[in-house]
Amino acid sequence: MQRTCYIGELNASLVGQTVILQGWANRRRDLGGLIFIELRDRSGSIQVEVEPDSPAFHEADTVRAEYVLEVEGRFQPRPEEQRKGGLADYEVIALRVTVLSAAKTPPFELDKGESVAEDIRLKYRYLDLRRPEMQRHLMLRSRAVAAATAFLDAEGFVQVETPMLTRSTPEGARDFLVPSRLNPGEFYALPQSPQLFKQLLMIAGFDRYYQFARCFRDEDLRADRQPDFTQLDMEMSFVTQEDVLDVQERLLAHVFRTVLDYELPLPFPRLSYQEAMDRYGSDKPDLRFDRAFADVTDLFRGGEFGAFADAETVKVLAAPALTRKQLDELERVAKQNGAKGLAWARREGDGLTGGISRFLGEQAAALLERTGVEPGGTLLFSAGEWKKAVTALGAVRLALRDLFDLAAGGPRFQVAWVLDFPQLEFDEEAGSWTYMHHPFTAPRPEDIPLFGTERQGEIRAQAYDLVLNGFEVGGGSIRIHDPAVQTQMFQAIGLSEAEAREKFGFFLDALSYGTPPHGGIAWGFDRLVMVMAGASSIREVIAFPKNNRGVDLMAGAPSPVSPAQLAEVGVAVTTES
């Protein structure tokens, strides 16, 4: 027998008809001689009623949680007093119940999954994925893939797969290495991104490329990181930055409209990197709420309050009224992010009290005017070297968001572009310049003469990040297509011609065979779906993720391999004492 429909497809037009449904027993209860089974499939659930004189009763009496069933019965409305809306207004009166597969007692109650330790859920992921919430997340992901694919196909993009076994090249994180059995002592690397290959496809003349690319980075994990993850990777030839941003805005709006029935206003707001850091202390600001910083460096320059007078930057953030405990917690956040402390003062009437108020004097009135802090509200100050000061206060701003649910009053989704990143940043530990995005990012043409000068830190990149609700969900750039500029970039980061040729020789050769201007972007697809689904971690939108230690608890990976396997690929394992 084949089912007549999914449970979620049942509707009023089928009332009185006999239906065949297949799925899992969510729960079973006995009441007044009747057996009630809640039957679940990926589309929904419905109550099955089995009457004592039904030929289905004996089989139904054996059913326990998570048994796999086929139910044939009459679809009908429930008594009016029992209706709760939707499918809960209906039930199926069983004529036949067939147990297709029995089940052991699950290690946790599926309908209480959120209260179960995550490691247990991950160990029994195949059970965790039966939960309606998890199925909604993965089905949303599937619809997002389909929507993006349809849009890109219509825009003339060509889907091309790039190699999974490639050469190890420096991209910022550690590579996952794969020993070559046929070439002893040599290794492949799993790709951190398809960066060079997609640029080679532009050199090859494919004009517009995309793929849902699997990427691998051996780095420390956070709530929004996995060692293996998915990018929606795109590249376009003969384009300017504006061309790329236009396609991306229309693509993201299409995905949200198709999948969530949500309209993203176009065009997306834009901030420069400098503005984002200056106002929000982050290059991926959450713009669902404002709470921008005020710069008050000038109010304290040369003044008597030494902690602020000599600081490169003094920023202030207006916050609601805060308790001593809350202030202590926010100071802890500031210190975790590089600040020496978090100064504060409270508004009382037309003046300031508490904290550092006794040092403010004539600055108090100007502070109230610039910040617009509410009566009883608190001013939070961060002072010192610019990047440390704004970054610490940016972390405090996000802690305030979580403490007072500040984003709840804003739009459900807020997208923005962050542009004009620095091309280079100085690595204090190494004492040298390094790239901020990757070494193939094109600088602004007017800034190219600054390479090799004392002002090369001022070079702006033609780079752009796509930010959604405070998460970076995409990042890209216009690429260098002039071999001479690529050489200048390598020199700026201390890469000699010989080193560049050893690492990227095949790519540098390709650049010399006629390279079109080109640019692209990659979406962090797991992270995007996480935000769309309202999930707390990308592990909630990936079918079989690793935990925050990079371990697959279900399959038991990573795992030791036999000495014979190691010998076959010429690898010896040493353990540190």
From Swiss-Prot:
Reactions this protein catalyses: tRNA(Asp) + L-aspartate + ATP = L-aspartyl-tRNA(Asp) + AMP + diphosphate
EC number: 6.1.1.12
Ligand binding (ATP): 217-219, 226, 472, 524-527
Subcellular location(s) of the protein: Cytoplasm
InterPro entries: Aa-tRNA-synt_II, aa-tRNA-synth_II, aa-tRNA-synth_II/BPL/LPL, Asp-tRNA-ligase_1, Asp-tRNA-ligase_1_N, Asp/Asn-tRNA-synth_IIb, AspRS_core, GAD-like_sf
Sequence positions that bind L-aspartate: 171, 217, 437, 479
UniProt main location, coarse: cytoplasm
Top EC category: ligase
Cellular component aspect of the GO annotation: cytoplasm
Keyword terms of this UniProt record: Aminoacyl-tRNA synthetase, ATP-binding, Cytoplasm, Ligase, Nucleotide-binding, Protein biosynthesis
Pfam families: GAD, tRNA-synt_2, tRNA_anti-codon
Alphabetized GO MF terms: aspartate-tRNA ligase activity; ATP binding; nucleic acid binding
UniProt-listed CDD domains: AspRS_core, EcAspRS_like_N
A Gene Ontology BP annotation from the UniProt entry: aspartyl-tRNA aminoacylation
Aspartate: region residues: 195-198
Gene3D superfamilies the UniProt entry points to: Bira Bifunctional Protein, Domain 2 (3.30.930.10), GAD-like domain (3.30.1360.30), Nucleic acid-binding proteins (2.40.50.140)
Family assignment from sequence similarity: Belongs to the class-II aminoacyl-tRNA synthetase family. Type 1 subfamily.
Role according to the record: Catalyzes the attachment of L-aspartate to tRNA(Asp) in a two-step reaction: L-aspartate is first activated by ATP to form Asp-AMP and then transferred to the acceptor end of tRNA(Asp).
Oligomer status and interactors: Homodimer.
Protein name: Aspartate--tRNA ligase
Organism of derivation: Deinococcus geothermalis (strain DSM 11300 / CIP 105573 / AG-3a)
